[in-house]
Amino acid sequence: SIGQKASIEALLGDQQCVEDMKKSFLKRRDLIVRLLNELPGVKCPAPNGAFYVFPDFSYYLNREANGKLLKDTFDISEYILDAVQVVTVPGDGFGSSGHIRFSYATSSKIIEEGMDRVKNALKII
């Protein structure tokens, strides 16, 4: 079938586009990890296989932002979204209290802008 022939070509054909994409993702991963680790109190290890990072934001738990106590990462994620329009995923939903998921499946420019916004949001906590 045409699907099988396309699959064979994808597996056995030129892999340069795969290598280029891998390099691009590694570059963006390193960028977001560096920018997150520059935020006060945030610890972000580099992931090995995903296109998202899962930094520890527990430093900001039980602090107040805009008159609201940040009890968990649902509160932190909601605060970041409301304050600076950056979407994150709370780690509490994955059983990982204190962590927030950020995707880096976007451009370096958007990552830089988003992390700058998050930095500004955290200044008032």
Q: Could you tell me what each predicted segment is?
A:
Residues 1-125:
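PLP-dependent class I/II
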